[in-house]
């Protein structure tokens, strides 16, 4: 758990959240998640069985004592807005606690949508000023982690910083996917590079680079001045990582905050857990992380609960089918409302209301809400999108050629099906990769399989009649 150096530090850390407003940037499309974000914003994507991705940032705010929160939305926001209204409306407005939705509005002063992360905040400055906060915490709404923001606030105040950026070491091979910083011994940021082609390594640790987590703390008045300057700067992309943070390094007013100082964990022996689930590969792996025997992210820690909208669902059920086969699961997460009948589920995540019929094997797969799996199916290393009905007898993830003809795969950057319905998978997972399956493609496949069964049954009837007639003629 997070530790404080003294009682005075602890007391100050408890006071600072009351002077703070958190702004969660939740308007991104998340195009690398392909069809998972075709109809919903990335922070609204399902995760870990019962949660949405944004629940982690929201829960971190509440658990840290930051109870004034603005959620900035834009792309496909309906699902996200609905989730927040249903699951996060319990804060006490009389105590000045709230989750405020800030959609893109194309105000009179600008007819454009949000042009970047900084512009998303800038276009809401009139609202944010009325919050009357001393400190602004800016968060990405699409990361999976548990963090005590009060500890980062304390670090920000004690160093006298105008801006503080949370940081974490990442493999040098992945550094080009993040904002990378160089720091002094006391973590003052001296240089910042947004997604550099050749990221500089950490001194003394050539295998890692120091990456930004997309978490910023600003003194409120200083942030307002910065955003107004950036808004009037020709050629700016109006982005924190590309424009705001790099210019602050020259002013020597920005510090880094190591994530291990504020990471919340129930097991000090495990490394700090933070995942950017911006690709299907990363999303699939992060979900299955939770199904491991000892996951690095403890979802059962009562001291730091992850809250979400709770649907009134019955418990998951594992039943015996008519043949006597028992439904069973191993190293998996199975959500409320699921029924597994005479099938085996291994190292997988079943989201709410999933139905798995008899004689199926589900291995290393994610079945999103309302998926229905017909009898005798075998699914391996798949992501099955919401409300898909897998037809009886379908096998996915065992034959590379067949999968390439029907779905996008992750092997060698993904195979594109002629139909173009399934979401392309980025990255490579051995040996076969995993597949992303969408409803509209499965409808076509289901019709083909049913037609095939119809032809086979009629052929069997014809052959039976033929042999009967032949036997009658032979008897005469």
UniProtKB/Swiss-Prot annotation:
Q: In which pathway does it act?
A: Glycan biosynthesis; glycogen biosynthesis
Q: Name one GO biological process term.
A: glycogen biosynthetic process
Give the SUPFAM superfamilies listed for this entry: Nucleotide-diphospho-sugar transferases, Trimeric LpxA-like enzymes
Q: Which PROSITE patterns match?
A: ADP_GLC_PYROPHOSPH_1, ADP_GLC_PYROPHOSPH_2, ADP_GLC_PYROPHOSPH_3
Q: What class of enzyme is it?
A: transferase
Keywords for this entry? ATP-binding, Carbohydrate metabolism, Glycogen biosynthesis, Glycogen metabolism, Nucleotide-binding, Nucleotidyltransferase, Transferase
Query: Which residues are listed for alpha-D-glucose 1-phosphate binding in this entry?
Result: 114, 179, 194-195, 212
Reaction it catalyzes: alpha-D-glucose 1-phosphate + ATP + H(+) = ADP-alpha-D-glucose + diphosphate
> Mind telling me which Pfam families this protein's record contains?
Hexapep_GlmU, NTP_transferase
GO function term, MF aspect, one: glucose-1-phosphate adenylyltransferase activity
What EC number(s) does this enzyme carry?
A: 2.7.7.27
Please give the family membership noted in the entry: Belongs to the bacterial/plant glucose-1-phosphate adenylyltransferase family.
Q: How does it assemble?
A: Homotetramer.
Its annotated function is as follows: Involved in the biosynthesis of ADP-glucose, a building block required for the elongation reactions to produce glycogen. Catalyzes the reaction between ATP and alpha-D-glucose 1-phosphate (G1P) to produce pyrophosphate and ADP-Glc.
Q: Which HAMAP family match?
A: GlgC
Name of the featured protein = Glucose-1-phosphate adenylyltransferase
Its gene name is: glgC
């Amino acid at each position: 758990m997070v530790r404080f150096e003294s009682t005075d530090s602890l007391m100050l850390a408890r006071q600072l959240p009351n002077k703070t407003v958190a702004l969660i940037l939740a308007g991104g499309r998340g195009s690398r998640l392909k069809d998972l974000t075709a109809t919903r914003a990335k922070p609204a994507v399902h995760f870990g069985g019962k949660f949405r991705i944004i629940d982690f940032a929201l829960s971190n705010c509440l658990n840290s004592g930051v109870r004034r929160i603005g959620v900035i939305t834009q792309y496909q926001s309906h699902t996200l807005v609905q989730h927040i209204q249903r699951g996060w409306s319990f804060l006490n407005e009389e105590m000045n606690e709230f989750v405020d939705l800030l959609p893109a509005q194309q105000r009179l002063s600008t007819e454009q949508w949000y042009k970047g992360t900084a512009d998303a905040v800038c276009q809401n400055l009139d609202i944010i000023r009325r919050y009357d906060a001393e400190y602004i915490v800016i968060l990405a709404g699409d990361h999976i982690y548990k963090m005590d923001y009060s500890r980062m606030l304390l670090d920000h105040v004690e160093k006298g910083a105008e801006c503080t950026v949370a940081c974490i070491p990442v493999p040098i091979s992945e550094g080009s996917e993040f904002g990378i910083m160089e720091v002094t011994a006391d973590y003052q940021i001296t240089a910042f590079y947004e997604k550099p082609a050749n990221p500089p390594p950490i001194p003394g640790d050539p295998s890692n680079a120091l990456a930004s987590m997309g978490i910023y703390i600003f003194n409120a008045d200083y942030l307002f001045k910065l955003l107004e300057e950036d808004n009037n700067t020709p050629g700016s992309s109006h982005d924190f990582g590309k424009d705001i943070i790099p210019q602050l390094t020259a002013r020597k007013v920005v510090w880094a905050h190591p994530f291990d100082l504020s990471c919340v964990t129930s097991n000090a022996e495990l490394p700090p857990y933070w995942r950017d689930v911006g690709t299907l590969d990363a999303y699939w792996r992060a979900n299955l992380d939770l199904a491991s025997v000892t996951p690095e992210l403890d979802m059962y820690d009562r001291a730091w609960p992850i809250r979400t909208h709770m649907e009134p669902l019955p418990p998951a059920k594992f039943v015996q089918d008519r043949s006597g086969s028992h439904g069973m699961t191993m190293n998996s997460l199975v959500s409320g409302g699921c029924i597994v009948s005479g099938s085996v589920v291994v190292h997988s995540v079943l989201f709410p209301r999933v139905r798995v019929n008899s004689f199926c094997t589900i291995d290393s797969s994610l079945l999103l809400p309302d998926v229905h799996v017909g009898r005798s199916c075998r699914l391996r290393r798949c992501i099955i999108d919401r409300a898909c009905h897998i037809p009886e007898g379908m096998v996915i993830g065992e034959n590379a050629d067949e999968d390439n003809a029907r779905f996008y795969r992750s092997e060698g950057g993904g195979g594109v099906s002629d139909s173009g319905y399934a979401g392309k998978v980025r990255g490579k997972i051995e040996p076969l990769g995993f597949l992303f399956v969408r409803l509209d493609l499965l409808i076509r496949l289901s019709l083909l399989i049913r037609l095939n069964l119809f032809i086979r049954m009629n052929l069997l009837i014809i052959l039976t009649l033929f042999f009967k007639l032949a036997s009658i003629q032979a008897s005469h």
